[in-house]
Amino acid sequence: MESPHPGLSDMDIPLNTSLIETMHASPTGEMALLDLHLDRLLRSAQALGFANPPRESIRRQIVEHVACTPLKGSDLRVRLLMGPSGKVALESYTLPPLTGVPLVAISPVRLKSPEPFLQHKTTYRPWYADTMSWLTDHPDFFDLIYLNEKNEVCEGSRSNVYLMQDGVWVTPPLTCGLLGGVVRRQLLASGQVVEKPIPAASLLTHPGQLRLSNGLRGWFDVQLVDFPGKLNRNN
């Protein structure tokens, strides 16, 4: 069967894979980036051959969930899962504020830029499994930044990456191997950021001019430090 997306086919999609959207809801229930989250969710559903439920039906489920959660009145992390059938599941958690300037380091693991699943936010993320465990054990770090086989910056395990170069904020293009984040899309559309490959060496020569973004935290400064130890949490 021909794939609906280059490099993907029915056999390539692991069993029980779901699409994910992780969204911020304000204490008043506002979700400023909801339309961008829905755009990405439905675009990936089509690419992966998932059922594509009506956009307004998904929106209504999200809005009703946020309105009814006992955690409302706080900043929330709202997690949406959608399986191949198009069925949506929602969970909410309180979202603590960031404190200080978060730390990041360069991951010792490399990504392969042609990997098609990098451009879709799904539960199939084996290349990030050790990083997520490591971050749990190292709460001072917000994320690890990944490089690809060309020694170019890709993304963090839960964020997009930006570097100030010659007075302009740049972020890697999707062809470097990364997820198109909702904040990244907003920044590109507004002209605050431009796409350009970022060689790994540039991170080391501009360590104080680095930002990350994601749908929960927005766009924020981080501090690059040396990676401490090994990625495998058992070492």
Regions found by a protein language model. Give the residues of each.
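Helix-start/capping segments and mature chain N-termini
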Residues: 1-77, 81-235
